[in-house]
Amino acid sequence: MYSVLLNPSNTEIYSFLTDRIYRELIVIFATCKVNYKGRAESVASESPRLIILKPDGTVIIHESVKREPLNWQPPGTKIEIMNDYPLKIVAQRNRPKEVIEIDLKEVFYITSAEVKEGDFTIKGREIDIVNTIIQNPSMIEEGFVPLTREYNTPYGKIDLIGLDKKGNFVIIEVKRSKAQLNAISQLYRYYLHMREIKGDKIRGILVAPDLTIHARELLQKLGLEFIRYDIKNYSS
């Protein structure tokens, strides 16, 4: 499942890397020098760094600061281990022509693992919130019945239209983060448009985790409504 080498010799490093490259995710912590040649040229002097080699050919070199790597190569990169002294990792791609050479001066540890891809789901998008409302219509109010989603208007798409228990059309605008003034203005445009089509029996409701003070003031002034949505209350 995983392997670890501590303070390995050059022979151990070479054997370990050549046996696992392109098969497992490899992480190396080492003092190294990094040379880059391609659209520009750069040299990073000897320093402790974290080197990641992925089975798809991705190469990433991290220092102790910042999110972005010092150097990297994308999937499809050709990775070679050169049994020189110091031992060298060469990561090369042809379009565009770019080469990273990593001279491993002192390796403190190497790990490798068989990392598998799992399912990835994003929750909290506006489309997910609309889905939640459709599955749990009572979160709007008892008796609410969803009718249509993504309803086209000249001003954009209404997230959801439904009916309340009194037969009023309900226009719902969803925001996944704190609603601003523009969210109220958008909802009001939809509200006016639907009044022209359906008459006076229209309600406009904003669904969001929260809204700004000015947005709340405008919402109340225009006769619209607000329902607070907390994703934690509806997460499986």
From Swiss-Prot:
Localization per Swiss-Prot or TrEMBL: Cytoplasm
Sample GO molecular function, one term: DNA binding
EC number assigned by the record: 3.1.-.-
Pfam families documented for this protein: NucS_C, NucS_N
Database matches in CDD domains: NucS-like
Gene Ontology CC annotations of this record: cytoplasm
Claim: Cytoplasm is one of the keywords in the record: yes
Domain of life: Archaea
Main localization (coarse): cytoplasm
Keywords noted in UniProt: Cytoplasm, DNA-binding, Endonuclease, Hydrolase, Nuclease
Biological role: Cleaves both 3' and 5' ssDNA extremities of branched DNA structures.
NCBIfam families: PRK04247.1 (NF003270)
Family listed: Belongs to the NucS endonuclease family.
Protein name: Endonuclease NucS
Lineage start: Archaea, Thermoproteota, Thermoprotei, Sulfolobales, Sulfolobaceae
Gene: nucS
